[in-house]
Curated annotation (Swiss-Prot):
Name this protein carries in UniProt: Aspartate--tRNA(Asp/Asn) ligase
Ligase recorded as keyword: yes
Gene that encodes the chain: aspS
Family, as annotated: Belongs to the class-II aminoacyl-tRNA synthetase family. Type 1 subfamily.
Broad class of where this protein is predominantly found: cytoplasm
Record's function text: Aspartyl-tRNA synthetase with relaxed tRNA specificity since it is able to aspartylate not only its cognate tRNA(Asp) but also tRNA(Asn). Reaction proceeds in two steps: L-aspartate is first activated by ATP to form Asp-AMP and then transferred to the acceptor end of tRNA(Asp/Asn).
Alphabetized InterPro entries for the sequence: Aa-tRNA-synt_II, aa-tRNA-synth_II, aa-tRNA-synth_II/BPL/LPL, Asp-tRNA-ligase_1, Asp-tRNA-ligase_1_N, Asp/Asn-tRNA-synth_IIb, AspRS_core, GAD-like_sf
UniProt keyword Repeat present: no
Site (Important for tRNA non-discrimination): H38, G91
GO biological process, one term: aspartyl-tRNA aminoacylation
């Protein structure tokens, strides 16, 4: 069969043929998509990665041997066809196909391979479990939508490299076998055979190495980097994922953000033909949380959070009053047109709120000139009017409220806001709302560990005005919690697609931050000693950013999960149904690396 290909060379991809090819003799290679027999005339749709074209075997125009060969064809047979391109007869055109005005009259047929019966059809919108799709990923990837996703991924790679190389960046690969460090998700560990008892870690990001490349004087680095995190998975997470990673010397936050905006603008124009306006809007972390309940707000719709805590201190409704007077937060959302929600739908919203930590949800419905609610009996007439004024309430609105600790109130209303927007079809999926979230806190308090933790990572620089207060903060976590960082996150339609910061570039400040994070001098030296040492040899000011490539691709393609833009993803349990990974290994292999495995019977 392979010998046949020596004389049979493809002229065109199926999807590239058009009316300019009418009259041409062409050679095509691909897979049989469908076979139809209409009155003895055999029609096949031949498919390759660029599309589909109709091939006709008409017994009145070809020999018996060729016709009988064509009759044997079934779905997913691999074939070569030589024939001439014709315009389809009037009335038989297919406007749904890119090649729907033409067909190829088959004159030669090579059957290069046959196929078993398929576990699912090779078409879009199939109703089959993701588990089955991933088990037969080689078939799933034949589907046109999946091929488009993988090709688009390649085009994004190319555009990223073009832009960054054109802006003075050098592509450098950093190690995949590195050292386990604290302050992050769990590491994937790799045992060393030569240094028994010791382990490499797969990198969660190239963070330390890219900073060291700045110390090395390369000034502008980038890498399309594989990263690994052993964490619980969800729709937008994978144990291994890809970042567009970059770092720059002698830069400010504005420099990095401007470069990142231009990169996104270039990629969207080059790959999708979409014009993105820059600069992007900027919003402080505090404003994002206060208005939208999240540090990655979706700005395609309103439903902003409204603070009624001061009013809640005055009313006799105990739930509001107790929370407001104990330092909590009472906030609401005005759902315009929400009065049409039934009591059952309001109860469903309450149950949804409870999933995220709410104890309940108060509501007020304004309908036909009346306000109805179980809580209004606790409000005076003046307090009711003040509430309606604060909430900008009009007839036809539904007001919902959460009263709890500050972080819970924001979190719950943030999720409710998104849920309501989806339920009421308020989201314009054609819009691209880019946003920078800036002025993040440098630290947050971990209640479980009873210590400060870094919001981003421990190498993020504090704002200049906070650097002089580092010593003071060592004895006062409250002071440290007021520090702002030189960090920035890029958000698109409510998804964080990238983030970075200006880094700490002096050993003194880095050591102070480690102290605030309760990382001892010994631990810092053991885990990060090579970085602190490097910073002491004239490290330039530097900063950078990493984009989540898989997430950007999911947004570009409208995919519900990043698994649809990765060729060979894992399931939500971290399993590869195609290969069966992870799997047990032999006792011999374990012995070579000095490991004994104890498996929990449960």
């Amino acid at each position: 069969m392979i010998d046949q290909l020596r004389e049979f060379k493809r002229d065109y991809y199926c999807g590239d043929l058009n009316e300019s090819n009418i009259g041409d003799e062409v050679r095509l290679l691909g897979w049989v998509d469908t076979v139809r027999d209409h009155g003895g005339v055999i029609f096949i749709n031949l498919r390759d990665r660029e599309g589909i074209v109709q091939v006709v075997f008409d017994p009145s125009k070809i020999g018996e041997e060729l016709y009988n060969k064509a009759k044997k064809l079934k779905s997913e047979y691999v074939i070569g066809v030589r024939g001439r391109v014709y315009r389809r007869p009037a009335g038989t055109e297919n406007p749904k196909m890119k090649t729907g005005n033409i067909e190829v009259a088959g004159e030669e047929l090579l059957i290069l391979n046959t196929s078993k019966a398929l576990p699912f059809p090779i078409e879009d919108n199939i109703k089959v479990s993701e588990e089955v799709r991933l088990k037969y990923r080689y078939l799933d990837l034949r589907r046109p939508s999946m091929q488009r996703n993988i090709i688009l991924r390649h085009e994004v790679y190319q555009a990223v490299r073009e832009f960054l190389a054109g802006n003075g960046f050098i592509e450098v690969e950093t190690p995949m076998l590195t050292k386990s460090t604290p302050e992050g998700a769990r590491d994937f560990l790799v045992p060393s055979r030569l240094e028994k008892g010791k382990f490499y870690a797969l990198p969660q990001s190239p963070q330390l190495f890219k900073q060291i490349l700045m110390v090395a004087g390369l000034e502008r680095y980038f890498q399309i980097a594989k990263c690994f995190r052993d964490e619980d998975l969800r729709a937008d997470r994978q144990p291994e994922f890809t970042q567009i990673d970059l770092e720059m010397s002698f830069v400010t936050e504005d420099d990095v953000m401007t470069l990142a905006e231009s990169l996104i603008q270039y990629v969207y124009k080059k790959v999708l033909g979409i014009d993105i306006k820059i600069p992007f809007r900027r919003m402080s972390y505090e404003e994002a949380i206060n208005k939208y309940g999240t540090d990655k707000p979706d700005l395609r719709y309103g439903l902003e959070l409204i603070d009624i805590t001061d009013l809640a201190k005055e009313v006799e409704f105990k739930v509001f009053n107790d929370v407001a007077k104990s330092g909590g937060l009472v906030k609401g959302i005005n759902i315009k047109g929400g009065s049409k929600f039934s009591r059952k739908e309001i109860d469903e919203l309450t149950e949804y709120a409870k999933k995220f930590g709410a104890k309940g949800m108060a509501w007020v419905k304004l309908e036909n000139g009346e306000a109805t609610s179980p809580i209004l009996k606790f409000f005076t007439e003046e307090q009711k009017q003040k509430l309606f004024s604060l909430m900008d309430a009009k007839d036809g609105d539904l007001l919902i409220f959460i009263a709890d600790k500050k972080d819970i109130t924001h979190k719950v209303l943030g999720f409710l806001r998104k849920h309501i927007a989806e339920k009421m079809n308020l989201i314009d999926n054609s819009k691209l709302e880019f946003l920078w979230v800036v002025d993040f806190p440098l630290f947050e308090w971990d209640e479980e560990e009873n210590r400060l933790v870094a919001i981003h990572h421990p190498f993020t620089s504090p704002k200049d005005e906070d650097i002089d207060r580092l010593d003071e903060a060592l004895n006062s976590p409250e002071i440290a919690l007021s520090f702002k960082s030189k960090a920035y996150d890029m958000v698109l339609n409510g998804e964080e697609i990238g983030g970075g910061s200006i880094r700490i570039h002096t050993p003194y400040i880095q050591e102070k931050v480690f102290q605030l994070l309760n990382i001892s001098e010994e631990e810092a030296k053991e885990k990060f000693g090579f970085l602190i040492e490097a910073l002491s040899y004239g490290a330039p000011p530097h900063g950078g950013l990493a984009f989540g490539l898989d997430r950007i691709l999911a947004l570009m393609t409208g995919s519900e999960s990043i698994r649809d833009v990765i060729a060979f993803p894992k399931t939500q349990k971290g399993i590869c149904p195609l290969t069966g990974a992870p799997d047990y290994v032999s006792e011999k292999q374990l012995k070579e690396v000095g490991i004994k495995v104890e498996v929990d019977e449960e």
